[in-house]
Amino acid sequence: MSNKKVQSPKEESIAKMLICKVHIGTKNLENKMKRYVYTRAKDGVHIINLAKTYEKLQLAARVIVAVSNPADVVVVSARPFGSRAVLKFAQYTGAQAIAGRWTPGMLTNQIIQKFIEPRLLIVTDPRTDAQSVKESAYANIPVIALCDSDSPLEHVDIAIPCNNKGKESIALMYWLLAQEVLYLKGSIPRSQAWDVMVDMFLWRDPEQFELKNLANEEATPTAPHLADNQYATDAPYDDWNKKDDWNDNANEEWKNPIAVDEW
């Protein structure tokens, strides 16, 4: 009989956060983020309290579920590492995803074609997504943000303290948030593990795929080279000037001319 202790959902989630380095902050510290910092390492990097990260994650999931129409939730990531994560989050929760550059005026300028009126905004980084956070303040739209130790909390309603610069950390945070949303909606029971892996939310560099394909092409074995003088032997020049008698090997029937009276 195994003596292995069964982990609670909180312990399991925090263990995954440690693996993906969610707790690793930056050397800079925003004054309003002090409450989420556990300690400071010898190298000056601030360590985030993952217990508070888990609590804020649960709170954010409940706010997302409270929005009746999932399409009224907009997930934004100007950071490349979060582009795939927000697209996958939107796919599984029904939200809208905006990966890449934010068009100015999407929340405030009704004339532009991309104008939207969401009820909730989720951003990957309040610093890189500052334009969308600022517009949400004008439009009175609540904001949920993944905040690092140096992230500004201005106009942010719910801050989820985490490492928002690592691709593994961003992927795991959106995966955990999507999983909790599906649990609260009843799409999957809590007794059942979500069959979607975190790798699906992980950003992949297209250049790495191209380099990998080139390496595979170079490693592919080619046809063996022809042996020396195989199929490539030059014909002797004497044969071209040699005069042969075509009747030497011919049958007697073909040598004799046809009689005229046979026609």
Swiss-Prot record:
Sample GO molecular function, one term: structural constituent of ribosome
Looking up Pfam families in the UniProt record yields: Ribosomal_S2
**Location(s) in or outside the cell:** Cytoplasm
Q: Which UniProt keywords apply?
A: Cytoplasm, Ribonucleoprotein, Ribosomal protein
Xref: CDD domains:
RPS2
| Role according to the record | Required for the assembly and/or stability of the 40S ribosomal subunit. Required for the processing of the 20S rRNA-precursor to mature 18S rRNA in a late step of the maturation of 40S ribosomal subunits.
The name this protein goes by in its record: Small ribosomal subunit protein uS2
The record lists the organism as Plasmodium chabaudi chabaudi
